[in-house]
Amino acid sequence: MKKILVTQSSMPSFEEYCEEIESIWDTIHLTNNGPKHKMLEQQLKEYLRAENMTLVTNGHLALQLALKVLNLTGEVITTPFTFVSTVNAIVENGLTPVFCDINPESYTIDADKIEDLITDKTSAILAVHVYGNVCDVEKLEKLAKKHNLKLIYDAAHVFGVTYKGKSVTSFGDISMLSFHATKVFNTIEGGGLIYHSEELYSKLDALKNFGISQEGDVPQESINAKMNEFQAAMGICNLRHVDNEILKRRNVVKRYR
C-alpha cells in the first residue's frame, strides 16, 4: 500500500546540497552572519520584495524578537486559532494575550470584533494568516492607525503569497516567517522578519546576538537566534525549487476542491 503523507519536507538533491556547503570548509565561517547567511537574506529580500529582512534560527524566536524590538507593553490582541508559539511569544515578552474570535470562513482573526477588545492597555494586534488565507489586512491597517497600535503578522503560512499585487509580508509594521521543515520553503529550522523601518535592522541584529551592538556594547539582555551557515545553505538550495513546491501544493488543493 502506498503511503500518502500529510506533510513531507522539501529537500534539494544530496549532490546539490553538498555542492552548496562545500565552500563552508574554505571559509570556516559556521555562523555569525556568514557568507551563506548574507546570500540567503539578499535572495529572500528579492524573492519576497521585502524592504528590510532579518534571518534568525527559527520562527518562534523571530516572533519573540518582533514583539521585543517594538517595545510593547500591556496587552496584545491576537487569535486563539494558531500554533502555541504565537501566544508563547507574547507571554515570554511579559505581555498579556487578549483573544479575539475568528472568521469561520478563513480561520483568520475577525477584524470586525477587534475594536470592542481595545483598551488603554492595548499596544498591538498580532494577527495570523492561516492555511494560506490572508487576514483582512485593509481593515486591520485602519484599526491599527486609528488606535495607534503596532500591527504584527504571523506569516508562517503565507510564504510567497500576494494580495492585490503586493507581498502579504509588506503589510503591518513587521511580519514573521517560519522556515521550519514542514513549510513550503525551509531552512531545516529557521525564520525571518520583514519590516519597513530600516532602523530596526541594527536593533534586531543586536537582539538576535545576545543584545550585543555593532560597537560591542551590550545595552540590553537578549537571546541567541542566529541562523547558521548550514541552515542558510539549505535555504539557498530550496529557494531554487520553491516555485515548483508551491505549484505542487496548489495542484493538491485544486484536486480536493
Regions found by a protein language model. Give the residues of each.
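Phosphate-binding glycine-rich loop
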Residues: H29, N33-E75, F81, A89-E92, ...
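Short loop/turn motifs at secondary-structure junctions
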Residues: R49, L72, K121, S170-F171, ...
